[in-house]
Amino acid sequence: MAAKIIDGKTIAQQVKDEVAARVTQRLAAGKRAPGLAVVLVGENPASQIYVSSKRKVCEEVGFISRSYDLPATTTESELLTLIDQLNADQAIDGILVQLPLPEGIDNTKVIERIAPSKDVDGFHPYNVGRLCQRAPLLRACTPRGIVTLLERYNIDTFGLNAVVVGASNIVGRPMSLELLLAGCTTTVTHRFTKNLRHHIENADLLVVAVGKPGFIPGEWIKPGAIVLDVGINRLESGKVVGDVEFETAQERASYISPVPGGVGPMTVATLIQNTLQACEEYHDHAE
């Protein structure tokens, strides 16, 4: 029996429509539109694509979008000064600094300089700590987007054995905290994990984020499992595939997210959700 496809494109559009409707209500009530500042340092082609999609969605939902395209020669102190200015700017609710940053700029220092109430990527240690303490404020976009997918498909996560493959700060680690919060018994696997297959064969819910095409063979998937594939890998042929071998996995899983069109669209939709949340929960009352 083929798995049900988790259609991230459709759910992401629903989320964007909900945010756009809320922006319209705000403007009708005499309030300002939420504002997002997107900072890009250097000319990494992949980063440029991500940034342009984020800016486009901002315009779609009626946000104020500000772009800061800085040369690769920008110093760390120049970038930190810009962040200080944006932290103080009352028209800006969210600050997004596109990673990776050029050599010589400390990612951690930059992330920690963003005011936690404007950290719409959800990477600041304060926001990660709040999630860890079961009192989340702004949450990392991809994990929160995955939780939204599970909720919209009415998938009951309580009591499931969840396995997260990949332990990055951006996806794997916050994802494990989100799944704990969602009532799962959660295992995080990484490059030092022994017998990865054993963990995956026992996973009721599997989230894979390693950035290696077809890294998880489809026959490892437990029958009836829910599979969320975060990987976006472009093959030499130009085809885009995930980290899970889709064709075989689809025959075994009960739900599976495709690549493209699964988790990917949810990341940007969640960024927009986070920016609206930052505006309404943290900044409206300060004005």
Swiss-Prot record:
Where do the annotations place NADP(+) binding? G166, A167, S168, I232
Q: Which GO terms describe its molecular function?
A: methenyltetrahydrofolate cyclohydrolase activity; methylenetetrahydrofolate dehydrogenase (NADP+) activity
What does the record give as the reaction this protein catalyses? (6R)-5,10-methylene-5,6,7,8-tetrahydrofolate + NADP(+) = (6R)-5,10-methenyltetrahydrofolate + NADPH; (6R)-5,10-methenyltetrahydrofolate + H2O = (6R)-10-formyltetrahydrofolate + H(+)
Q: Which InterPro entries match?
A: Aminoacid_DH-like_N_sf, NAD(P)-bd_dom_sf, THF_DH/CycHdrlase, THF_DH/CycHdrlase_cat_dom, THF_DH/CycHdrlase_CS, THF_DH/CycHdrlase_NAD-bd_dom
Q: Which GO terms describe its biological process?
A: L-histidine biosynthetic process; methionine biosynthetic process; purine nucleotide biosynthetic process; tetrahydrofolate interconversion
Domain of life the protein comes from = Bacteria
Keywords attached to this entry: Amino-acid biosynthesis, Histidine biosynthesis, Hydrolase, Methionine biosynthesis, Multifunctional enzyme, NADP, One-carbon metabolism, Oxidoreductase, Purine biosynthesis
* Single GO cellular component term: cytosol
Q: What EC number(s) would the UniProt record show?
A: 1.5.1.5, 3.5.4.9
Pathway, according to UniProt? One-carbon metabolism; tetrahydrofolate interconversion
- State the similarity comment: Belongs to the tetrahydrofolate dehydrogenase/cyclohydrolase family.
What does this protein do, in the record's words? Catalyzes the oxidation of 5,10-methylenetetrahydrofolate to 5,10-methenyltetrahydrofolate and then the hydrolysis of 5,10-methenyltetrahydrofolate to 10-formyltetrahydrofolate.
Mind telling me which PANTHER family this protein's record contains?
C-1-TETRAHYDROFOLATE SYNTHASE, CYTOPLASMIC, C-1-TETRAHYDROFOLATE SYNTHASE, CYTOPLASMIC-RELATED
Q: How does it assemble?
A: Homodimer.
Name of this chain's protein: Bifunctional protein FolD
